[in-house]
Design a protein with these regions (language model features):
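C-terminal cap of thioredoxin/glutaredoxin-like
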Residues: 2-5, 9-32, 36, 106, ...
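Structural alpha/beta surface segment adjacent to cysteine/selenocysteine redox centers
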Residues: 16-118
Length: 207
């Protein structure tokens, strides 16, 4: 089967947009998604520090268009994206929690709830009580989650995924790979991702 990896951090609005569509893309193409939670701040610190300067001093014209573009995409994807009072949010704990959800088989539901809590309901998803509420909403045991996110294994998995993305040439979230080498960045590349997945699947069928 064609390999399809989705590297993501729930603190990114553009990742929320991609996330809202990517499962349908995978179904249409007949592939499974390999979910790769990362800490996008770690990626920025390593290879894309200009993000911080752009946030602190946005170009006025480009900044106005950014707001419109995000609003247009949110409407197109039928998701609610507001202005969280805490932005950027400290996402390390919620991204560790994604691994617990992944192991429990409910990562898509957990990530969806996290995106909705932060971008739709404007909750501070760095807070333990908000993470617990998200976990409960998808049936995760809160006590197990609290212990697991402090484990060396989960911490290492988040660090490893983040370092893997950097090593493979990634610089932000969402980043997608098809068959290891073919990289795509950003929500607006999903149309290209779908075309490439279809082509890869057709090639396998004909082989």
């Amino acid at each position: 089967m064609t390999k399809f990896e989705f590297f993501f951090d729930v603190s990114s609005p553009w990742t929320y947009l991609a996330f809202s569509q990517v499962e349908d893309v995978a179904v249409r193409c007949g592939v499974e998604i390999i979910w790769k939670p990362i800490l996008v701040g770690g990626v920025f610190n390593s290879v894309n520090e200009t993000v911080y300067e752009q946030r602190a001093n946005p170009h006025p014209v480009k900044g106005r268009y950014y707001v419109k573009d995000l609003r247009d995409w949110a409407q197109f994807c039928d998701v609610k994206i507001g202005n969280p009072p805490v932005f950027p949010v400290r996402a390390v704990t919620i991204m560790r929690a994604c691994f617990v959800a992944l192991d429990a088989g409910c990562l898509p539901a957990f990530a969806k709830a996290a995106f909705e809590a932060y971008w739709g309901d404007l909750k501070d998803i760095s807070q333990p009580e908000e993470i617990a509420a998200i976990a409960q909403s998808v049936g995760l045991d809160v006590g197990h989650l609290a212990a697991a996110i402090q484990s060396d294994d989960v911490k290492a998995r988040l660090r490893d995924n983040t370092e893997e993305l950097i090593a493979r040439g990634g610089f932000g979230s969402p980043t997608m790979f098809i068959n290891e080498q073919d990289m795509y960045f950003g929500n607006d590349r999903l149309v290209l991702v779908e075309a490439a997945l279809m082509a890869a699947q057709n090639q396998k069928t004909q082989a």
